[in-house]
Amino acid sequence: MPEMGALLLTTPALAAPGELLNLSLNASAVAPEGAVLLAMLATLLVDLAGEKVSTRWVPPICYAGLGTALLLLALQWNAPLEPSFLGAFLPDHLAIAFRAVVALSTLLSLMISWRYAEQGGTPVGEYAGILLAATLGGMLLCGATDLVSVFVSLETLSVASYLLSGYMKRDARSSEAALKYLLVGSAAAAVFLYGSSLLYGLSGSTSLEAIGQALLSSPTPLAALALVFVLATVAFKIAAVPFHQWTPDVYEGSPTPVVAFLSVGSKAAGFALALRLLVGCFGSFDTQWKLLFTVLAVLSMTLGNVVALAQTSMKRMLAYSSIGQAGFVMIGLVCGTEDGFAAMVLYTAAYLFMNLGAFACIILFSIRTGSDRIADYAGLYQKDPLITLGLSLCLLSLGGIPPMLGFFGKIYLFFAGWADHQYVLVVVGLITSVISIYYYIGVIKMMVVKEPQEASDAVKAYPPVQWSTLGLPPLRVALVTCVVVTAVGGILSNPLFQWASDAVAGTPLLQQAIASVNGSSLG
């Protein structure tokens, strides 16, 4: 991205000193993050006024902050591309797309959280404030273009995630999940810092663009070692095998709305980080990191979907499912083509709705029964057809059944992989997709096919459905929204793919990588 460097170099001749600072900072680029920050501060201040005031005002404050952030992101789509904070942040189309996924995942996670938080005795203001802090870190991470801004954003997201996973203080499993997450996450942060120090020593700069140019001109074995450390951190954030060990325990022990956010928002930020670091810094090691990610993708798709077959907990099953889903997204990353990157963006957005829709159903069921055991869903159709329908559609979409949105997302990934001759990834993806359908269909069959006398004890004691109960309307809105987008989104897959393609086309970093791949293939 030489035009960015030229922009900063020519600015002094064009602007006065006071204007120079404004142009270099370009704070308007992070206006969406500013809206989230203001909402976070407001929730914490309102929380000081007491529980009743907090319960009344925190939700609308969060909706206003996140809604404003999404609106500002939409306005940035056609704005001129300018670096922010002295080149440490770049609001390109890739950043806008992933920031929108993070913000929208938080909005939907909060909508499915209120009733769950009230039932568990969780202070709403504190919970929302920490979740917004995680959102702030995730959104900044999507556009960070400097090692310092990457690390600060990464740790903001990580520390808030540790607090959220252990927020149910009365639950021993939640405390255990937080401790495991903290230990593994701290190790990943230390590994990233060491890799960053190697990159700084090799290039003399913390800018990802400058590091990429330095490694391109003089690749060394030490740079390959830095690649291994950075790749390990990225694999931890996206829960790729073999850096996935924390995922099942953390997902099972953490509060369910937190798991919903971690499975989508945190993972989306992780994939944005992967694109920034691997494509931006390690272009000279393109063959090596793609080979490593091919292995990670095969392991993630295989282990995630095979181990999910044996799970008895819905949250644990979706944890292993998310590991497999990360493997599918990695197909687009390994391709390195325009269609591959676009399919990656599209599937991440599709995963947002189908996964959060499934978690909304799980939360509703756990509120009414106190259970997340798969066996307890037996005969649910007799008592709650809405949850049964919503969960069935979301699981079918996760499995890639047509005409759901997830089917078209996988089709675009597999087509991109096949066109790039990634035959192993495509074949493994197809086989593991069939395996995933088996355990998804198993849950649906249990809910629908079981006769009334075969219903589980939890379903037999299922309370009458009362949508007017306090806190349930936002949950119902989130559930219906996710289910409708999941079911109808397949029909609109072409416009969605065009949006994803525009995101790739508006990202100079990816265009350079695509041009490099096309040039090498022609050569």
UniProtKB/Swiss-Prot annotation:
Its EC number is 7.1.1.-. InterPro entries: NADH-Q_OxRdtase_suN/2, ND/Mrp_TM. It is found in: Cellular thylakoid membrane. GO terms for cellular component: plasma membrane-derived thylakoid membrane. HAMAP family: NDH1_NuoN_1. This is NAD(P)H-quinone oxidoreductase subunit 2. Belongs to the complex I subunit 2 family. NDH-1 shuttles electrons from an unknown electron donor, via FMN and iron-sulfur (Fe-S) centers, to quinones in the respiratory and/or the photosynthetic chain. The immediate electron acceptor for the enzyme in this species is believed to be plastoquinone. Couples the redox reaction to proton translocation, and thus conserves the redox energy in a proton gradient. Cyanobacterial NDH-1 also plays a role in inorganic carbon-concentration. One of its GO terms (molecular function) is NADH dehydrogenase (ubiquinone) activity. It catalyses: a plastoquinone + NADH + (n+1) H(+)(in) = a plastoquinol + NAD(+) + n H(+)(out); a plastoquinone + NADPH + (n+1) H(+)(in) = a plastoquinol + NADP(+) + n H(+)(out). It is a multi-pass membrane protein. The chain crosses the membrane at residues 29-49, 57-77, 94-114, 128-148, 182-202, 223-243, 255-275, 291-311, 317-337, 345-365, 389-409, 424-444, 477-497. Pfam families: Proton_antipo_M. The keyword Repeat does not apply. Keywords: Membrane, NAD, NADP, Plastoquinone, Quinone, Thylakoid, Translocase, Transmembrane, Transmembrane helix, Transport. NDH-1 can be composed of about 15 different subunits; different subcomplexes with different compositions have been identified which probably have different functions. Signal peptide: none annotated. It comes from Synechococcus sp. (strain WH7803). The lineage of its organism: Bacteria, Bacillati, Cyanobacteriota, Cyanophyceae, Synechococcales. One of its GO terms (biological process) is photosynthesis, light reaction.
